[in-house]
Amino acid sequence: HPDPNPIWARELMDAMMADGAPDLGAASDGDGDRNMILGPGTYVTPSDSLAVLAANAHLCPGYSGGLTGVARSMPTSRAVDRVAEKLGIAAYETPTGWKFFGNLLDAGRATLCGEESAGTGSDHVREKDGLWAVLMWLDILAATGKSVPQIMADHWAEYGRDFYSRHDYEGIESDIAAGLMDDLRAKLGDLPGTEVAGRRVAAADEFAYDDPVDGSRAEGQGVRVTFHGGGRAVFRLSGTGTSGATLRVYLEDYTDDPARFGDDPQVALADMIAAADALAGIAERTGRTAPDVRT
């Protein structure tokens, strides 16, 4: 399957969640450019994986001199940004699409890059490299002598945890989907300072990207609404053809409370799920009370 995740790699997920699971489980797609990382009883989101690789890259021989910068696609969680801030390096936020990382890698502005859809790579090659990511995880396990659950627990203890999930609503009638996004865009300017589902909006915009290398500009790259306290909801539309459109909703919330680090992400994101529905009127407009795919 082109998307290695807990839904499509269910057999591997079940094995890694069972008693006696091995130290590391990993999956990739058919051509090896995407990856999924698992430990005993532990699923590592692509966003968290990128952050852990950045925080521990100095333990790997090829990156012992440190990183020049990191880059993530806009819908990817901001976990890696927290690592970059502590390391004192640049963190770039790009539109979805690997091509946007290319200029940053070629110009030496970023060493590691990644996206929530399980693509990870570095400046050793201009493309995403799932096998490299798995090997780098093995390097980190060997260098630290820690398990995947221990590495994640230590990472969250230092940086806090960004709970993250993507909800896909598939096969929505194209005119309904387009109307939903148009209405969402129309009210962005009025959202800051208002309260939605019990959370106060800090900022709202439609993401645009100015490439720092070649000066090009990419507009209309997704609607994002951020909340005080670290919450965020991102809305993107894809596939507006005859088979209908897919609405992708990317949900994120942050905590630095150790008592919450072990919470189930869907429970921890309840505020953001409610806020996203209230903002976009998903249930009212589509009749859907739950996403078709939740990762």
Q: What is the predicted role of each segment?
A:
Residues H1-R161, V249:
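Phosphate-binding chemistry for phosphorylated carbohydrates and sugar-nucleotides
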Residues K146-T295:
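Catalytic-core signal marking the mid-to-C-terminal active-site face
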